[in-house]
Amino acid sequence: MLAKITRSSFYASRAVGRLSGSIPTSPAALASNCRYIQIERKRTKSHEMALYETVEKGAKNSPSYSLYFKNKCGNVISPMHDIPLYANEEKTIYNMVVEVPRWTNAKMEISLKTPMNPIKQDIKKGKLRFVANCFPHKGYIWNYGALPQTWENPDHIEPSTGCKGDNDPIDVIEIGYRVAKRGDVLKVKVLGTIALIDEGETDWKIIAIDVNDPLASKVNDIADVDQYFPGLLRATVEWFKIYKIPDGKPENQFAFNGDAKNADFANTIIAETHKFWQNLVHQSPASGSISTTNITNRNSEHVIPKEEAEKILAEAPDGGQVEEVSDTVDTWHFIHLK
């Protein structure tokens, strides 16, 4: 049976007392305020407290595998709907949910249709999906994930690209030095964006850096990426251009001739997708393609009691045989561009 709990690497930046203004002392107050519920936690060198943890269900490398999220109170949450977009709105610092760590191939993503939106591996034609290694790249070349509480609206034609949204949370690539873990929630600073046109849909790729990265104080906009990460933007465009070719698909196209837009432009796009998400999570009836079940958005008709969210986790498939990943996943593909 597999029900392993791991800890997020995203930590609170302030002590509990400063978060609340005052610390309740009565047992009733402590019980009613989730921020004071004591949970086992991993600490960084600065002894900051983890805000999120993950729970694995099902067998790894199988369709049953799911990675659920809990907040620091131990409540099951949706990483798409219950984790705030902003870690610090005043400083324009965002939360990023890591779906795919750097150098890995499994195409993991927030499951839009599954209640509480766990991370699952994408399946196509009955098989688990792995991203091909296109020479000279190995797997994903950055930490890859999504910004919570965003949604690229498929009914909206983006004026700057002329294409509709792709019906997903907005994607983000994190370029810092650390290889993150699946399910990590990072605080990131946005540097810019690339506009991938994937099968006729706008698929923004936000470029960001973990605020705890040693270079975070030096990179503040897209021009800084070329200075401190020379070659990375060029490699990023190449990666997105060719990564589907080994699967028999044509090379991807880009808006703006593949040029990256700056941080201000990216922040505007993020704000727009956040508004689309707000409409999504509050719309009635619920979207047929996306589960909007959540526990924190009180004005949403799709909010559920935390006990019901816990039941969803408890009823998720558990156990099973861990499956081996085929050696062919490590194949290097050499691409001839036309």
UniProtKB/Swiss-Prot annotation:
Family to which this protein belongs: Belongs to the PPase family.
Additional record remark: The ATPase activity of NURF is stimulated by the presence of nucleosomes rather than by free DNA.
Give this protein's Gene Ontology molecular function annotations.
inorganic diphosphate phosphatase activity; magnesium ion binding
GO CC aspect terms = cytoplasm; mitochondrion; nucleus; NURF complex
Task: List where in the cell it is found.
Answer: Cytoplasm; Nucleus
Task: Give me the gene this protein comes from.
Answer: Nurf-38
PROSITE patterns documented for this protein:
PPASE
Protein name as catalogued: Inorganic pyrophosphatase
As cofactor, the record names:
Mg(2+)
- InterPro entries attached to this UniProt entry: Pyrophosphatase, Pyrophosphatase_sf
What EC number(s) does the entry state? Answer: 3.6.1.1
Q: Which domain of life is it from?
A: Eukaryota
Q: What is this protein's function per UniProt?
A: Component of NURF (nucleosome remodeling factor), a complex which catalyzes ATP-dependent nucleosome sliding and facilitates transcription of chromatin. NURF is required for homeotic gene expression, proper larval blood cell development, normal male X chromosome morphology, ecdysteroid signaling and metamorphosis. Inorganic pyrophosphatase (PPase), hydrolyzes inorganic pyrophosphate to inorganic phosphate, essential for driving critical biosynthetic reactions including transcription, replication, and DNA repair.
**Catalyzed reactions per annotation:** diphosphate + H2O = 2 phosphate + H(+)
Residues annotated as binding Mg(2+) 2: D171
Subunit-level organization: Component of the NURF complex composed of Caf1-55, E(bx), Nurf-38 and Iswi.
Biological classification of the source = Eukaryota, Metazoa, Ecdysozoa, Arthropoda, Hexapoda
Residues annotated as binding Mg(2+) 1 are: D166, D171, D203
Q: Does the record carry Transcription regulation as a key word?
A: yes
Name the positions where diphosphate binds: R129
Annotated GO biological processes are: chromatin remodeling; nucleosome organization; phosphate-containing compound metabolic process; positive regulation of DNA-templated transcription; positive regulation of transcription by RNA polymerase II; regulation of hemocyte proliferation
User: Could you tell me which Pfam families the record lists for this protein?
Assistant: Pyrophosphatase (PF00719)
Sorted alphabetically, the keyword list is: Chromatin regulator, Cytoplasm, Hydrolase, Magnesium, Metal-binding, Nucleus, Transcription, Transcription regulation
